[in-house]
């Protein structure tokens, strides 16, 4: 089913351009109130939603618009102010609310923003529910009678509740005493959350990217720009650096030598730590982009590996379908469903730190069994509407290349969703092998 407004992670765009305008967001709140809240079980007595945001300047405007939309539909609203996306998921479930809403564009620049929803159980909405909200958007917006309007109020203990939840996912018998951490909050929603979490567990914390001004979120700091973190780890003689993005649902880690570890490697580490603790891990879920070295390493440890479409929502769907608990993406979205219902950068960092504490080893030592395969990516510009899947020359080249890579590499070809480009990606044990195969495939397309 084609969706008009919802993408892979809610509704997102440039502030001031449709659909991220105050009038549309108010109508979105009203439509979502009708679909999500009415009839939902709630501990508040009346349908009630939780609204949180990151630190973008536009969050004030969009928060007010959502508040108007929900209350006009007869739904109560609780406002948290700036809080990581996974914190909203947790509190929605913990407070027994009808739904949760986050105003954030995650790792995007400050001039973008978005709206995403969580169900009463703290899960991302399935496609069918998003389609129902879109259908409700096409209906006239009819305000509830005055006696039925919702109320809005701020809750003051949201940050403290979420900090305690994060700490509860770290083994009680362990602590972080003697560990020096640099924590990069991307000037985003974790600025007042992440440093206290690690400090209260005993770490010596150096916080950077923790002075949001509404316009500096993700700007040169955070999981998508780790250079400042690498510098700070070295300058402070820290043991580790942790980088979150603007809404703190993704994680990148830097060791004392300045080496950066991505989500693929961290997923492997968490799986192996669960096994070391005596837990059965039947399988893990990655995406089409997960490095093949991780897949092979997991299979050597008896762990099945499945690839989902790119996007943490699809990783989550695959995990739920198989009743597995661990999955993630190279970008740093990591899912530990035995700890939280959604991807959580802070909780993921605590799982990594727990593995280090339990093993007494360094990151490099724990990941010695995973040497990421080199990747070669070639973007081939094509005519609009070009069907690469039936291109005879490409199919012939692929048939020649793939047997050479079997067990030592793989091919991924996909069309860009935003421009007339076909992306040819090859990864292999040796860089030369990947480059040679990618060039052969790109040449077949006429690059």
From Swiss-Prot:
BP-aspect Gene Ontology terms: carbohydrate metabolic process; peptidoglycan biosynthetic process; UDP-N-acetylglucosamine biosynthetic process
Keywords, in A-Z order: Isomerase, Magnesium, Metal-binding, Phosphoprotein
Cellular component aspect of the GO annotation: cytosol
Enzyme class: isomerase
InterPro entries: A-D-PHexomutase_a/b/a-I, A-D-PHexomutase_a/b/a-I/II/III, A-D-PHexomutase_a/b/a-II, A-D-PHexomutase_a/b/a-III, A-D-PHexomutase_C, A-D-PHexomutase_C_sf, A-D-PHexomutase_CS, Alpha-D-phosphohexomutase_SF
Cofactor detail note: Binds 1 Mg(2+) ion per subunit.
Enzyme active site: 106
NCBIfam families listed in its UniProt record: glmM (TIGR01455), PRK10887.1 (NF008139)
Name of the molecule in the record: Phosphoglucosamine mutase
Species this protein is from: Cupriavidus taiwanensis (strain DSM 17343 / BCRC 17206 / CCUG 44338 / CIP 107171 / LMG 19424 / R1)
